[in-house]
Regions:
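Short, polar N-cap/turn motifs at the start of nucleic acid-interacting alpha helices
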Residues: 165-172, 238, 257-276, 301
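C-terminal catalytic core of tyrosine-transesterase DNA break-rejoin enzymes
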Residues: 84, 143-146, 150-157, 226-229, ...
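Catalytic-site neighborhood detector that most strongly recognizes the C-terminal catalytic loop/helix
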Residues: 124, 175-183, 195, 259, ...
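Basic, Lys/Arg- and aromatic-enriched nucleic-acid-binding interface segment
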Residues: 85-88, 101, 105-155, 159-161, ...
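Short, aromatic/basic-rich helix-turn unit that serves as a nucleic-acid recognition element
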Residues: 18-48
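C-terminal secondary-structure termini that scaffold catalytic or DNA-interacting sites
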Residues: 14, 170, 181, 200-207, ...
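Active-site/catalytic core of tyrosine-dependent DNA strand-transfer enzymes
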Residues: 170, 179, 191-237
């Protein structure tokens, strides 16, 4: 499938006895990133570039806690969110840790306290909102939205899905571990709505491309713009594609699916998502309320 690709990483050998600078720390970090096959390399490189604007060319041992605090203040003034700044300084800390393990440094700065982050987003799609928004999306985007809404999968897991992963006869979609953010494969039963999506995609399948979701053979991109415009046209508050993931987890619980099974379907490794977004089975709350009223009534009689 065509689309933007990351330029290849080029790792220059480090001369023996060369001074350890921020730039060498960054190179070692990216080498480790590639070796570990971590996801979101583009994001990691972008964060490093923010760090490079402040620390580029500096000797590693001259970077101290005050410098890191100044960086936090600088990024705040630029309008960066606390969560973004924390991710960037975590990368810087990781750079030093790698250098320590390699014997390139014998110490690292004591990093300042992480910034207090805003509570996580709690956006959800109500079903009528979902229908209105998808009606204002081009078909390729609507199909991805459908799959996200009924699966709870992550965006990249959906966009990188291939027909090798789809078993329409067996009625399952299999996500291979190397394409999962958590590196754990999983199986998704093909429900009626998902089958309709996959049938549509099958009719649009390109012989030269094995990806399920594309737009005339090109990667489906610019999601934020597409959803923003569709939400505006539908008179629905702005939503993100990731809101489908939260919505799917909530809908599974509301449907009476045990949390353990819901986690297997969506790929959540811990139940923290249910606490974070206050996802509860409302029927259980209603039942608990009735039991409380019944108990009080009996205790007074």
């Amino acid at each position: 499938m065509t689309g933007r690709k990351n330029p290849p990483l080029e790792f220059a050998p480090v001369p023996e006895g060369a001074p350890i600078t921020f730039d060498l720390l960054a190179q070692a970090y990216l080498e480790d990133y590639v070796l570990q096959r971590y996801k979101a390399l583009t994001t990691a490189r972008a964060r490093i570039e923010h760090l490079r604007q402040t620390f580029g060319g500096r000797l590693a041992l001259t970077i101290n806690a005050n410098d890191v605090r100044s960086y936090q203040l600088h990024r705040r003034k630029e309008g960066a969110e606390a969560a973004t700044i924390n991710r960037e300084t975590s990368i810087l800390s990781r750079m030093f840790q790698i250098a320590l393990r390699r014997g390139q440094l014998d110490r690292m700065p004591l990093f300042p306290t992480r910034l207090q982050e805003n509570p996580p987003r709690q956006g959800f799609f109500e079903h009528d909102e979902f229908l209105k928004v998808r009606a204002n999306l081009p078909q390729a985007y609507a199909d991805v939205l459908d799959f996200a809404y009924y699966s709870g999968w992550r965006r990249n897991e959906i966009l990188h899905l291939t027909w090798d992963d789809v078993d329409l006869i067996g009625g399952v979609v299999r996500l291979s571990p190397h394409r999962s953010k958590t590196r754990a494969g999983r199986v998704l039963p093909i429900s009626t709505p998902l089958r309709a999506v996959l049938k549509r995609r099958q009719r649009l399948r390109k012989r030269t491309d094995n990806h399920v979701f594309h737009r005339d053979g090109v990667t489906v991109r610019k999601w934020r713009n597409a959803l923003r415009d569709a939400c505006q046209a539908a008179d629905v508050p702005h939503r993100l594609l990731h809101d489908c993931r939260r919505t799917a987890a909530r809908n599974l619980v509301r449907a009476g699916v045990p949390e353990r099974v819901a986690m297997l379907l969506t790929g959540h490794k811990t139940r923290a998502v249910f606490d974070r977004y206050n996802i509860v089975n409302e029927q259980e709350l209603l039942t608990a309320g009735e039991r409380l009223a019944d108990y009080v009534s009996k205790s007074r009689s």
